[in-house]
Amino acid sequence: MKVRPSVKKMCDKCRVIKRKGKIMVICPNAKHKQRQG
């Protein structure tokens, strides 16, 4: 899980979602997991 000021899709399979007010990227590729912090 990467914590970044700006989250971006890194590939076609990445999904940008909002969970408990936090913007997150979920993806089958574990390296692409990110959340905004």
Curated annotation (Swiss-Prot):
- GO MF entries: structural constituent of ribosome
Q: Which InterPro entries match?
A: Ribosomal_bL36 (IPR000473), Ribosomal_bL36_sp (IPR035977)
**Keywords, alphabetical:** Chloroplast, Plastid, Ribonucleoprotein, Ribosomal protein
Q: Which GO cellular component does the record give, naming just one?
A: chloroplast
Where is this gene product found?
Plastid, Chloroplast
Main subcellular localisation: plastid
Q: One matching Pfam family, short form?
A: Ribosomal_L36
- Tell me which domain of life the UniProt entry assigns to the organism this sequence originates from: Eukaryota
Q: Biological process GO terms, please?
A: translation
Q: PROSITE patterns given for it?
A: RIBOSOMAL_L36
Q: Please give the positions of the paired cysteines in each disulfide bond.
A: none
NCBIfam families annotated for this entry?
Answer: rpmJ_bact (TIGR01022)
Similarity comment: family membership: Belongs to the bacterial ribosomal protein bL36 family.
Supply the name of the protein.
Answer: Large ribosomal subunit protein bL36c
Q: Name the species this protein comes from.
A: Trieres chinensis (Marine centric diatom)
